[in-house]
Amino acid sequence: MSDPNVNDAIEPVESVEDELGTVEGADNEDTEASAEAEAADDTVVAETDEDATDAEADETAEATDAEATEAEADADADAAEAEESEEEPEAEEPELDPIEKLRQELRVLPGEWYVIHTYAGYENRVKTNLEQRAVSLNVEDYIFQAEVPQEEVVQIKNGDRKTIRQNKLPGYVLVRMDLTNESWGVVRNTPGVTGFVGNAYDPYPLTLDEIVKMLAPEAEEKAAREAAEAEGKPAPQRKVEVQVLDFEVGDSVTVTDGPFATLQATINEINADSKKVKGLVEIFGRETPVELSFDQIQKN
């Protein structure tokens, strides 16, 4: 016979075991559920990361495409500018007027310009002597330059016409120098020099305008010649002074040929280009203007 108390005691044990099994099953279910949830979360995170990565990749690709497009646009713009530059060469700066160019060059040169007297006809010789003495006497640092301004003229003599270059300032030479006792002595004692223009021992230098005026004709002639040579053209003809060495206005001449032969005439105008003169011839007690050629008259 079983003891009811024992059965009662056993039943609680089974109940406890059942409860433990239930709890363990629940725990297992919770664990599985948690694992599934974690797996689901990992899947979501992975998918999210993949989406983010894809989005970043898309953005990077779009940015790269945009940069490439911009680079192509810049390259096209540069190419267009290069073509325009080739088609439209840069405008050249206008050349300075020869006189203004001369003025700028003279303004920056060292020293000042002085004028010295020379014996007539000794101008070029003085220039050469002075340049040589500046070197031999070691004053190149004080005496920089000597100039004899020249001009082109046409001379007519005995009916012959020829073009020559002659001194524009007969009896004078221009010297660019720093005036010191030593340099003054070298210039003053150069053969052919008679002295400085102005105060003999403390001469006054020329102004910039004065020296430009003296050197301008040669500068203009040089610029015109160089421009013509650059274009392959002959040098332009410049208007030059015409000197008639045979006759002068006011000369008394005898007519040697023509209807007024043997008559006396006084020259009041000379046309060197046509080789003719205009003068007054006395006819029947009255002075009559006539035109005569050079070969029709003889100087008295």
From Swiss-Prot:
- Transcription regulation among keywords: yes
Family, similarity comment: Belongs to the NusG family.
Q: Which gene encodes it?
A: nusG
Q: Which Gene3D superfamilies does this chain map to?
A: 2.30.30.30, NusG, N-terminal domain
Q: What's the name of the protein?
A: Transcription termination/antitermination protein NusG
Q: What single Pfam family name could you report for this chain, choosing any that match?
A: NusG
Record the organism: Streptomyces coelicolor (strain ATCC BAA-471 / A3(2) / M145)
Which purpose does this protein serve, as stated in its record?
A: Participates in transcription elongation, termination and antitermination.
- What's one GO-annotated cellular component? cytosol
Q: Where are the transmembrane segments?
A: none
- Gene Ontology annotations of biological process type: DNA-templated transcription termination; regulation of DNA-templated transcription elongation; transcription antitermination; transcription elongation-coupled chromatin remodeling
SUPFAM superfamilies to which the protein is assigned, alphabetical: N-utilization substance G protein NusG, N-terminal domain, Translation proteins SH3-like domain
Chain intervals for the UniProt region annotation (Disordered): 1-99
